[in-house]
């Protein structure tokens, strides 16, 4: 049935499968095209900065690099396919395309949530438990990063093999979890995803950043040398950047979670069409505001970006080894990531 529906003409889909007019589709398509271009360009610049300046290749930034990869993945696949379908007036890429599109968006989205959790754990171990942080090696960070990617892959594959399903949303121009079919399979999948990939990560992040904040307050009020204050200033920059990213993650994914919860415990037919399209758009929005957060909240990254635009081949960034926490700030080297 879904395959047949996806094969219908643009006109019939606009009448039967989409709750939006073509003008509304065009507005969404314009947004997607602009946001996609900004996201791809900005995240490529982010990767270029990390590649160019070895001073930025720290364990925490290795996680940020992977976040940039997830953003590029959504921008290069999710935005173009959805924009093309909006311009067409209905889903343009058939049943297989729907599965690939929705699966990749869930894959990159869940991976980014996992990576943000890893950043929070890294900040906690680096600042609050430096003795543990010192023992974290290349394999430790690789394992944490791979865990985030594997988690994303698992939840992306489940609807394809039968736990819930992917289908076009009410606009008919994008594919996602089929929340209009709120059967037992959908409800169990949705509740598990929200618990494991929303509630648990937020709990871990809150715990980590709460204790990080206490540690930073303690050290900033103590009588420290200038070099110690400089090291803590760097740590505060990285932590501030991480906290802003978490807050924006909450803003981005909350509408989508609300839609899924509404569909699970209420009547999916009563979900307002604007909310149905705003939810996935919000979820994708982190792809273009994350690079802005790196620039605004991190002085080292900001200096590196300016240096790259000035075509400087090397940027002087003093790396200190005074504090135990320097494990998470030293450039990547053999034996450490």
Curated annotation (Swiss-Prot):
One of its GO terms (molecular function) is G protein-coupled receptor activity. Disulfide bonds join 98-175. Found only in the eye, where it is localized to the retinal pigment epithelium (RPE). In the RPE, it is localized to the microvilli that surround the photoreceptor outer segments. GO terms for biological process: cellular response to light stimulus; G protein-coupled receptor signaling pathway; phototransduction; visual perception. Gene3D superfamilies: Rhodopsin 7-helix transmembrane proteins. It is found in: Membrane. Glycans are attached at residue 8. Pfam families: 7tm_1. InterPro entries: GPCR_opsins, GPCR_Rhodpsn, GPCR_Rhodpsn_7TM, Peropsin, Retinal_BS. SUPFAM superfamilies: Family A G protein-coupled receptor-like. Residues 50-61, 122-140, 213-240, 298-337 are cytoplasmic. It is a multi-pass membrane protein. The modification N6-(retinylidene)lysine is found at residue 284. The chain crosses the membrane at residues 27-49, 62-87, 102-121, 141-164, 189-212, 241-264, 273-297. Residues 1-26, 88-101, 165-188, 265-272 are extracellular. GO terms for cellular component: plasma membrane. Keywords: Chromophore, Disulfide bond, G-protein coupled receptor, Glycoprotein, Membrane, Photoreceptor protein, Receptor, Retinal protein, Sensory transduction, Transducer, Transmembrane, Transmembrane helix. May play a role in rpe physiology either by detecting light directly or by monitoring the concentration of retinoids or other photoreceptor-derived compounds. Belongs to the G-protein coupled receptor 1 family. Opsin subfamily. This is Visual pigment-like receptor peropsin.
